[in-house]
């Protein structure tokens, strides 16, 4: 058994050792706070503390200097009967608390103030981050409200119930759309010069079936169109050919092709005598044994066949040729003079001076007309 003095001595040694360890940590806290406050004399107190701190592994002997008024050490007494520690400080203030060690300064106030300041900073940051969004949303809501009010004010002032009823009527809307489409189509028809007449007529009939007034149709300036076409004559005889129908032009095409072949044959022949008189050639009857009939025989047979369908009582080829009402229609002027024959069947030829120069002058004009018609005529492309 240990004596009471030994136990007390042991407790004093333990308390001194524990006090030295605790004082080191509390001195560090105290030094940091003094640095923050800008107090003077930190180095001096630090020197005093370094003098009083024992080296590790050594027990600092108890001296009376620990309990002096200038000392900053905190001494812990052994546990009392009530289970509390008596905390002694240099300023003479004693505090008791179970299971805690307190320093002279009011650390609760410091920690609570720092905690409150951190909470205030956090709350301020939250308010700063949330406030712009809310303000933006609030501004947008206010602007939307203002725009809606302005729009509604305009609608209420200019509201027309009859017009609204008409818009709601589906039949009226369809009719308005149809009229708009028809007006655009009419505008296109009136400004399209290259439109097919048959297609144009079909479109106009379709528009009339929709109940459109006739005053809106056929408003195209026809006179100007004809005038423009008349200025575009690009080949010889265009004004004459424009009077023929498509069927007549097909017949003329066949006749011109046969005439070209016959003229080429006569041109490339090498007769022993001078160039024959074309009028005398007309007097000669076509040979029935000839394999290649001449243009005169071909055209006479064609007109005979055509005239027999129109006048069944015709008696002779020459009479049908001369009395055919289509003679002036199908034969150009220079050919009609060559094939002219009176009603008695006798051949009458015009002035000799004109016929002598036929092969030199008129044949060139015929070839020129044929070549122009075959190459540059848009009308020939329609015939083909």
UniProtKB/Swiss-Prot annotation:
Membrane-topology annotation of the record: Peripheral membrane protein
Recorded GO CC terms: peroxisomal membrane; phagophore assembly site; vacuolar lumen
Principal subcellular localization: other
Compartments, as annotated in UniProt: Vacuole lumen; Preautophagosomal structure; Peroxisome membrane
Gene Ontology BP, a term: protein transport
Phosphoserine: residues bearing it: 112
Regions of compositional bias (Polar residues) in chain numbering: 45-63, 278-291
Region (Disordered): 1-63, 266-291
Entry comment on modification after translation: Phosphorylation at Ser-112 is required for micro- and macropexophagy.
Keywords in alphabetical order: Autophagy, Membrane, Peroxisome, Phosphoprotein, Protein transport, Transport, Vacuole
Compositional bias ranges of the Low complexity kind: 13-27
Assembly information from the UniProt record: Interacts with ATG11, ATG17, ATG37, PEX3 and PEX14.
Role according to the record: Acts as the peroxisome receptor for pexophagy. Required for both micropexophagy and macropexophagy, but not for the cytoplasm to vacuole transport (Cvt) or autophagy pathways. Required for functional micropexophagic apparatus (MIPA) and relocation of ATG11 to the peroxisome-sequestering arms of the vacuole.
Protein name (record): Autophagy-related protein 30
